[in-house]
A protein has these predicted regions:
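Glycine/small-residue-rich loop that forms an oxyanion/phosphate-binding "nest" at active or ligand-binding sites
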Residues: 83, 103
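Hydrophobic alpha-helical transmembrane segments
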Residues: 1-78, 92-100, 107, 113-154
């Protein structure tokens, strides 16, 4: 049981900004960390649903609610997945040799294609949320998507 609790803490410490108690970070204790990824998605989904529900309940401006909904996963995860998307976009859009693309992946600077991809990514999410946030079932499905997408580690 202690090992599972440790894996839970490691998963949240690595893939979220949610503060966790100190975990024992060794290879043997991290074997089942991936099993707890869906719980991180569950937290993101629950917060997203709560924001959508509160936005409707208290009559917030739809544009504001949609913008906050887009930011919830970024705030919970620290943007780790967005960073990976943007690095990949820069590398694949460079049309360079394989070695140079790998260098671009490791580069901490954002290139033009990363900025374009970020704008498109956030605009698409904003558009989806602005259309669906008032429909509780659609919002629930989108919220559950954060959990389901983390159920398959590969």
């Amino acid at each position: 049981m202690k090992m599972l609790w440790n894996n839970f803490k490691v998963a949240f410490a690595m893939y979220s900004k949610i503060p966790m108690p100190m975990a024992d970070w060794n290879k043997e204790n991290m074997k089942y960390t991936f099993c707890f990824f869906p719980f991180i998605g569950l937290v993101i989904g629950a917060l997203s649903y709560l924001v959508g529900w509160a936005g409707g309940k208290f009559g917030f401006n739809p544009s504001f609610v949609s913008a906050v909904l887009v930011l919830v996963p970024v705030m919970v995860t620290g943007g780790i997945h967005v960073d990976g998307l943007l690095d990949t976009s820069d590398a694949l859009s460079s049309w360079q040799e394989r070695e140079r693309r790998l260098e671009i992946l490791k580069d901490s600077h954002a290139g033009a294609f990363a900025v374009i991809t970020a704008c498109a990514f956030f605009l698409i999410w904003y558009g989806a949320y602005s259309q669906l946030w008032t429909d509780r079932r659609a919002l629930l499905i989108m919220a559950l998507g954060f959990m389901v997408s983390r159920c398959c580690p590969e």
